[in-house]
Amino acid sequence: MLKDDFLKYQAKTTPNPLGISVAKAKGVYITDTNGKKYLDFVSGVSACSLGHCHPKVTRAIRKQSKKYLHVMVYGEFAQAPAVNLCKELIELLPENQESVYLTNSGTEAIEGALKLAKRATGRSELIGAHQSYHGSTHGALSLLGLEYQKTRFRPLLPDTRFIRFNSEDDLKLIT
C-alpha cells in the first residue's frame, strides 16, 4: 500500500525507484515494514557519513529542538551552533579563507559554487563531468553528466562543457 501510494503520488528522482517501505533505520541499515534489513547504499549526506540515528546526532537534535528548530540560515542571525562550526572550519582552512557559506543541501552548495566560480574568475564558462550528479535545481542540472535526466528541462545554463573523469586530455577543454 505505501509503495503503491509512493509510486502514484510522489515525484521520482530515478526511472526505477527502489520503493522500499521504510519502517526504521539504524547505522548502515534500513529496515522495511516487513522487517527485512537492507544495507543502505543510497543514504543521504548525514546518514552516509555517520549512519542512521547516530546517538550523538539524535542527542544533539533533541537538545537543540528544546531551544529552537530553525531561524533564518543565511547570515541574518547569530546562532551559536552555526558560528562555532564556521569558526572551527576556518581554523582548518588556508589563511586566505575567511568565511563559510552555509547551505541546507548539496544542490544549494552547487548553486553557490557556480556563482562563486563566475565571480572569482570573471568568466561564464562552467565545467561538469560526464556521469556526474549534482542535484536537481536548474544550475545543478546544467552540470549533470547524465543526459537522460536533464533532456526534458532544456535549455539549461549556457557555456557548459563536460569532461571525463581521469582524462588529462579533457583538462585542456577548460579555458
Go through the PLM ranges and name each one.
Residues 19-42:
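Active-site and channel-lining beta-strand-loop segments
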